[in-house]
Amino acid sequence: MTNSAASDQEPVFIEVGEGDGRRRIAVRAREGAGPGLFWLGGFNSDMKGTKALALDAWAAEQGRACVRFDYSGHGESGGAFVDGTIGRWLEESVAVFERFCL
């Protein structure tokens, strides 16, 4: 990963869940010093929203790591919003954190 501008970053996709509950989750992660930022979007928001982009830009300027992702049914991730549940979105959050933040 590079310290390119937020708009230049291409998403990486990971698979979360099993069987029919499997979802394709879009993630944008930049390496940097810690502590880093882990963006958890709000209800019906996505990682390309103004707040997420502002935090990513700050992280880039400060040399901090930053991880943003879209929950299933949001932004660049797969799935339909109506199929989303708090449990699914929690599972996605944990999977992204474990893959990109540890």
Summary of predicted features, one role per range:
Residues 31-32, 100-102:
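Glycine-rich phosphate-binding loop signature in dinucleotide/nucleotide-binding domains
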Residues 34-43:
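Short beta-strand element of the alpha/beta-hydrolase
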Residues 44, 79-85:
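Short glycine-enriched, charge-decorated loop/helix-capping segments at active-site entrances
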Residues 54-78:
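Conserved alpha/beta-hydrolase
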Residues 83-101:
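Alpha/beta-hydrolase active-site loop
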